[in-house]
Amino acid sequence: MQFNKRIDANQLDMKEQVVDIRRVTKVVKGGRNFRFAALVVVGDENGHVGVGTGKAMEIPDAIRKGIQAAKKNLLLVPTVGTTVPHEVIGHFGAGNVLIMPAKEGTGIIAGGPVRAVLELAGIKDVRAKSLGTNNSRNMVSATMDGLRQLKRAEDVAKLRGKSVEELLG
């Protein structure tokens, strides 16, 4: 069962991937102030994944801040073998991501930002379809929402007060 306890990123061997870097502008009386915003995904490829955004005047600083933010909101993803336990739809803004289990050996069938999250989560066989917007920030957040909704059969059986055999039929 997933509780809202914090996962210590320092004890995990984390890998990071930069999904998106944008130059953002603030217009002031004296002209324009440019900054960079980086969207970063971190994961240990063993069930832990997190997403963070960092903003700074320089790109490396923005990426570093994004990594720190991602490590602060890690998520434990329940898996069944090499895939997800069940089909789920994640929503964020105008973006929806349909995540479906796949047979072993299928690989990750997903588009850019969604693929980055699923790879770093350690899911090896999965199919995903991006619906709605193709904005990378919304796609990553919708994928995280979908992964947050996943539940193992044991957890659902415990919630319903039944055994796993009764639940699965």
Curated annotation (Swiss-Prot):
With S4 and S12 plays an important role in translational accuracy. One of its GO terms (biological process) is translation. Pfam families: Ribosomal_S5, Ribosomal_S5_C. This is Small ribosomal subunit protein uS5. Residues 14-77 form the S5 DRBM domain. Part of the 30S ribosomal subunit. Contacts proteins S4 and S8. The N-terminal domain interacts with the head of the 30S subunit; the C-terminal domain interacts with the body and contacts protein S4. The interaction surface between S4 and S5 is involved in control of translational fidelity. One of its GO terms (molecular function) is structural constituent of ribosome. The keyword RNA-binding applies.
